[in-house]
Amino acid sequence: MDFYPVAIEKLIEEFAKLPGIGRKTAQRLTLHVLNLPADEVREFAKALVKARGTIKYCSICGNFTDSDPCAICSNPNRDKSIICVIEEPKDIMSMERIKEYNGVYHVLHGNISPMAGRGPEDIKLRELIRRINGDVNEVIVATNPNVEGEATAMYISKILKHLGVKVTRIAHGIPVGGNLEYADEVTLLKALEGRTEI
């Protein structure tokens, strides 16, 4: 194990808590930050603190926002009769990259995963059900194409069928076991166009 002063070791530990960041990458990030000019470090720290203090969840869809409702939910040009259900806020960014979807979103903030101890009550399904009214014609389920995403999609289909709304699933142009975050625009567009009713 490397020997660093306590302050450096603490920064390495904090960077290593980020998803996809191991100890080696955390060390590189730490050393990079320490070599930045002091004013850049201050700006970086201010940006982190400001984002953490001002960003919240949209009360309608659950997306990250600095105003409530978010820009998508408050946009009068969005088709509110179509709701695309996704697992995490980052998936909205992926879907928006294709520039073809004009509906609104619903963020579950997770998926159903019995192995991880997450059931339907642990994700934002009650909020989704509350959004289904006479104005919603279709719910597109765009959960990730893995075991948990499929289980979540089937559960959503089952509960929404009773409400008389059309439920579709994006096509599997996205590799099984993959994440929306890593899909390119063409793959996402094909998956959206090839969605099927579930």
Curated annotation (Swiss-Prot):
Keyword Zinc-finger among UniProt keywords: yes
Oxidoreductase listed as a keyword: no
Family per record: Belongs to the RecR family.
Gene3D superfamilies: 3.30.60.80, 3.40.1360.10, 6.10.250.240, RecR Domain 1 (1.10.8.420)
Gene encoding the protein: recR
Keywords assigned by UniProt, alphabetized: DNA damage, DNA recombination, DNA repair, Metal-binding, Zinc, Zinc-finger
GO biological process entries: DNA recombination; DNA repair
Function recorded in the entry: May play a role in DNA repair. It seems to be involved in an RecBC-independent recombinational process of DNA repair. It may act with RecF and RecO.
Molecular function (Gene Ontology), one example: DNA binding
CDD domains, sorted: TOPRIM_recR
Protein known as: Recombination protein RecR
Segments forming domain Toprim: 81-175
Zinc finger (C4-type): 58-73
